């Protein structure tokens, strides 16, 4: 406290004259320590000496460069402290905006599920949603039982220690060294023997619930996880109901007139009209234009031939008749015998036009007779307008030819029959009534293809057709564009507080160290998460603390849901070595006090002087290896407290026995050495007396006034993150959710007005099948439909093999500057991947909920006794994870006693994660035991419920202290220290609102009809009629 003890160094002899003689004395009392000189240069390391007797512990030397990282050691055997109370889950953050749904691709053919693909690189972190407010702190959970301790491995061989030389001047700090390459992994050794199980301790009484801490600022949301492997394609969906008939296509423009077809067969003459004046018998006229088939009438008798009259004047043109309804095609009639030609008579006058008689049924045509003499040409009737071209029908049986009237609109064009012989031109007859359609005849030969007619009038929309057979699944379409970020949803409701659980067992109550209590510093703002720093120095084993009295038991709460994995914190920097206090006499054990009520946490006290190393206590059985908790975020570092004045001097305690020396830790990067304050005067060392019994505890020291706060040094350099481990397999596939509702059907387009049809052209030979045209452009996006039902979550995949740790990167230079503002959390490092499960179906991703913020750190509990639970099984060595970001500098804890190796327990099943507790202060480090061989990894045990933290023990009697020197300025930060304890994971944010599944959009406008392709080969199916047309399915 007042300076260093240099009595172990060789002292020069002192001469003293006495009565003319001269004799030499031993070392005299040590004078006051002068101010510290400037640091000298670092000397070169000397050769390794032979192992000598263990000397007094020397002052810590400069930290050497970080060596290669060795294999992971066995799990520590520290006593499990009480877990803090669990906080209420935070209010969920607002979900992001829902993205625009991409275009639906074509349904692909279902392929066989492929092998799980290589896991892709982690995607870029998504945009952080607005953090939700942190909820109130929940009731403390019930403390879990201490599991069985893991086996202790065999102790490694200690390196030979050279003789301790005199302490040289402290040189100036050199530049940070480069990190060494990773060392080879050690081999597995034999498993140790199983030790006996100790008795279970009594259960503690129920304590009072703790007071809820204030609500802190919201934390940053966690980064997105790694992308999972794509799931196998699902089964093809059931074919949907057929859609409504699409709108009629727009007919193309009128094509050029085709070639004239062959002449039809000459039909039988129609019924005779009213008798005219007698004229000469005319010759048979040429066949007139074929009229449309009319309704069937009885066959009329042929009237007698009238006498030839004089040719009358041409009558007026008949009225234009409307197009008749299309009748079914009649059957082909048999060809009849053509009668002999009559003698030509004189042309008589045209008689009065009689009423049109009913058209008789078409008779069988007669055989063609001999050609008669040419008769006089008849009058040509006026030409009618050209009617629209209908679909080519099958030729019906020719009906009788009536008298030619005014030319009406052309009916449906039938297939032209074989060309018959040309007849003589005759007179134009009147147009008869349409007869009933005859039976459907056999199809005639193919006619010529006519030119495409103008657009027809809009047809009436047909009814919904019957569902056709399901076609083969289409090919998989291209993925649609990524949607934009959706709006943030409203925060969710506050969760229900958990029930009050039973209290956990009381922890042992430890003695308080001396030192004045300083005020608690304000919580600083959190700085940005830096990259992981290199491994720090491994600390020397500390002194064994005396067991403390038991504190009150905390009440237990129900375990909450497992929190999301936080960002792993880096290793904290090693703090400066405190001054070594003088050895005091051992006081007697104080009476054990009754547990007091839990008080509000007081301000943090200043760090006391380091005492002498006590004797190692009996080793209790090692506790079980707990389930590895998710690493929490690094909390903000508070400012340094003021150093208080020293308390009153107590009686010095007896010097404890030196504990077993642990294995040498790895060397970290050398940090610059801070200036040392002025030393106080050191008293002379007396001879060590025999160890007496422990005396009664002295009265508590007077609390001094807090000193001024020191400045915090700049953070150490950050290391480079190693490469991620190999990816794991995908998880199991979840159940497929039902399909969303179908969107509304689009409005049918309007058909343009129809134009007049063209004539039928000659039909060419069938061409080769044409190639498929390019797909039409996609229609507009449809309205969003109702959201589908959320499918059941997939089962969690099994834990996979660990990835190989990457090499530690080269550290950057040491930066000096004020702490920066808190930045967003970094991406999640590669963890242990699960075994490959069935691939889940890709669903709409929900918005990431923001992680809960870290609660205020609870007051530091006293160190408990070693547990005596059953021994757990040896676990397999875990993988070296990637180096996480550097955490805040934790206070260096006092080392605990060395525990003996416990027996190996059976592998327990992995239990569910316990509730998230608030982040506690960093505990005191225990003495490092002998290094054992890595055991097989056991299953994670059940995480117990947290108990209430025990109250602070009474302050012990302070040791003699010298006058406190002035506090020197804070030196630059040293290299990063060892990893701090894993923090409690943050609360899992609520799942985002699932976006609604978009509904099917309206149908796009129909494209223009393409040119008719050649008929393909028949593919089977069946014919059905619709609106008078025949279709093949």
UniProtKB/Swiss-Prot annotation:
User: Which keywords, in A-to-Z order, does the entry hold?
Assistant: Calcium, Collagen, Extinct organism protein, Extracellular matrix, Hydroxylation, Repeat, Secreted
Bias type Gly residues, positions: 276-285, 318-327, 459-468, 551-560, 692-701, 749-758, 812-834
Q: Which domain of life is it from?
A: Eukaryota
Give the chief site where it resides.
secreted
> For bias kind Low complexity, which ranges apply?
25-71, 154-175, 221-242, 286-296, 340-356, 391-410, 519-528, 540-550, 583-627, 634-654, 672-682, 703-712, 766-793, 801-811, 873-909
Q: How is it modified after translation?
A: Prolines at the third position of the tripeptide repeating unit (G-X-Y) are hydroxylated in some or all of the chains.
Biased segments, Basic and acidic residues type: 655-664, 919-930
Q: Where is the composition biased (Pro residues)?
A: 1003-1015
Kindly state one GO CC term assigned in the UniProt record.
collagen trimer
Its annotated compartments are:
Secreted; Secreted, Extracellular space; Secreted, Extracellular space, Extracellular matrix
- Tissue expression as described in the entry: Expressed in bone.
Residues covered by region (Disordered): 1-1033
| Database matches in InterPro entries | Collagen (IPR008160), Collagen_Structural_Proteins (IPR050938)
Xref: Pfam families = Collagen
* Further facts: These protein fragments were extracted from ancient bone material. The displayed protein fragments were extracted from an ancient caudal vertebra bone collected in Ultima Esperanza, Chile and around 13045 years old. The tryptic peptides required multiple purification steps in order to eliminate contaminants and to increase the concentration of peptidic material.
Q: What binding partners and quaternary form does the record give?
A: Trimers of one alpha 2(I) and two alpha 1(I) chains. Interacts (via C-terminus) with TMEM131 (via PapD-L domain); the interaction is direct and is involved in assembly and TRAPPIII ER-to-Golgi transport complex-dependent secretion of collagen.
Record's function text: Type I collagen is a member of group I collagen (fibrillar forming collagen).
Q: Report the family membership.
A: Belongs to the fibrillar collagen family.
Protein name, entry field? Collagen alpha-2(I) chain
Source organism (scientific name): Mylodon darwinii (Giant ground sloth)
Starting at the broadest rank, the lineage of the source organism is: Eukaryota, Metazoa, Chordata, Craniata, Vertebrata
